């Protein structure tokens, strides 16, 4: 909308974005206060993580602020993971860590996923994405081979997510 030549369209689009941004800032202040008052409440922690995931996905923040909140999100997810090992938390961590390019921590999360959900498609999707992102061709090829040999079930979503690599490994 910012690139639109119609001044009125641009004005309404910017006004809407500013309002939405204000709303997120207000909600952020509320949840931060709630968390500060009760940092050990798992419900508040989950609410804070869910909010940050939503807020970060909107793309409203400047790069520096986004980095600060991504770091905060990682720390909160790790705290959740300390309370309870959970696949959803691991997936959220992998999503965030890959954006941050924190491969050291991503590898640790992959190990947790491997120990707990080795036959699950989420583990394999993230392992292959991780190896591809790191340009670890040999390990990627080995993982694709293991995926086939171990007869890991992939849903249509999993096949779509790994389609590029699966198609390439058939040749």
Where are these regions (language model features)?
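Generic helix N-cap/helix-start motif at coil->alpha-helix transitions
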Residues: 4-13, 24-27, 39-49, 55, ...
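Alpha-helical repeat scaffolds
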Residues: 1-2, 24-38, 62-81, 103-114, ...
């Amino acid at each position: 909308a910012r690139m639109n030549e119609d001044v009125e369209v641009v004005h309404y689009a910017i006004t809407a974005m500013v309002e939405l941004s204000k709303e997120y800032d207000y909600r952020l202040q509320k949840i931060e206060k709630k968390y500060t008052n009760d940092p050990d409440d798992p419900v508040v922690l989950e609410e804070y993580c869910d909010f940050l995931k939503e807020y970060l996905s909107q793309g409203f923040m400047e790069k520096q602020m986004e980095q600060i909140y991504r770091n905060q999100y990682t720390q909160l997810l790790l705290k959740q993971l300390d309370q309870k090992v959970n696949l959803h938390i691991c997936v959220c961590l992998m999503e965030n860590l890959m954006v941050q390019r924190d491969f050291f921590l991503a590898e640790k999360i992959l190990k947790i996923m491997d120990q707990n959900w080795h036959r699950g498609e989420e583990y394999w999707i993230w392992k292959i994405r991780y190896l591809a992102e790191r340009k670890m061709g040999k390990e990627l090829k080995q993982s694709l081979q293991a995926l086939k040999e171990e007869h890991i079930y992939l849903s249509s979503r999993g096949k779509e997510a790994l389609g590029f690599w699966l198609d390439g490994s058939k040749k």
